[in-house]
Structures are given as C-alpha cells and as structure tokens.
Amino acid sequence: MTTIVSVRRNGQVVVGGDGQVSLGNTVMKGNARKVRRLYNGKVLAGFAGGTADAFTLFELFERKLEMHQGHLLKSAVELAKDWRTDRALRKLEAMLIVADEKESLIITGIGDVVQPEADQILAIGSGGNFALSAARALVENTELSAREIVEKSLKIAGDICVYTNTHFTIEELPNS
C-alpha cells in the first residue's frame, strides 16, 4: 500500500506521501508520485490504494472541483456519493486525502468524508497509523514546521512499514 500524511500548522498545509508501488510482496516501483496538485494548484491530493483506481478518482475529483468552483467539501461529498452508488466506481480500491488552504479531508470508497481532529493531522495507507502517531507527537512537542513534521512522520512510517519507502513527494499550500 503506502503512506500519505497531511499536517496543517501555522497557516500552512502540507501533504506528503512515499513512492512505493507494490504488487503482492514485490516492489514494482519506488518513485511513484502519489501526491498531486489539482484545480490549478489550489488543492492538494494524495492517494493510498490501487494506482489506476486513484488516477480515476483524481480525474473525477478534479471534475467535481470544476463543477463546484473549487469548493472542497461539496466536491468531496459529491465524489463520495458517486463512488458509493456507481457500480463501476464502487469497485475502485483507494482512499484520498485532499486539502486546500482552508480545510483537509479524507474521502473513502464507502462514502465517508472525514474531517481531521482538532490537531488538523490526517494519515491513510498501510503506514498511516505510524505517520499519524509520529505527527501528533511532533505537533504536541516541537515547533517544527508542517513540512518538517510531514517529512519526519513519513520517514518513521518508511522505517516501520514494509509497504512504505523513503522516496517522498511533498506538496504545500501556500507555496513557500
């Protein structure tokens, strides 16, 4: 699978992910780009799960963003609704983290749209719980930037989870 983590701190939101693509117990690729910018660079999105499925979902989500003038929550709810009810989409196996300058969300294939706890940290994928734990500890006990927390959290997840590597793609808003 993978690890995707998002941290929002001091007016900045950062989404990062590793680059490992696995097929069963074999690493197929080590430098996949699982975090992207959508909607003219105003929305960050990262995926965990099937790569082909995720690209389909990225395209659908970008269409929803266009349809709803970039309104993140409305677009996420509409995507989740379609994902849950459409026969073909229902078979897609992936999860998304999406974020803009105001909010961050997880979108799941069972129709859930999840907002973060008060700490504004989200994580998904096989290494998600490791990254989430690390990020929470770093937010509570350091003054590190959101980007530094994402980097360190992904490194910890990559050291523990066999389906996560340490080749990272990290995007942030506002751009630094």
From Swiss-Prot:
Residues binding Na(+), per UniProt: G158, C161, T164
Active site: T2
Covalent S-S links between cysteines: none
Keyword Transport tagged: no
Catalysis performed (reactions): ATP-dependent cleavage of peptide bonds with broad specificity
Localization annotation: Cytoplasm
Gene Ontology molecular functions: metal ion binding; threonine-type endopeptidase activity
Family affiliation: Belongs to the peptidase T1B family. HslV subfamily.
Name of the protein in question: ATP-dependent protease subunit HslV
Organism: Pasteurella multocida (strain Pm70)
Higher taxonomy: Bacteria, Pseudomonadati, Pseudomonadota, Gammaproteobacteria, Pasteurellales
Gene it is expressed from: hslV
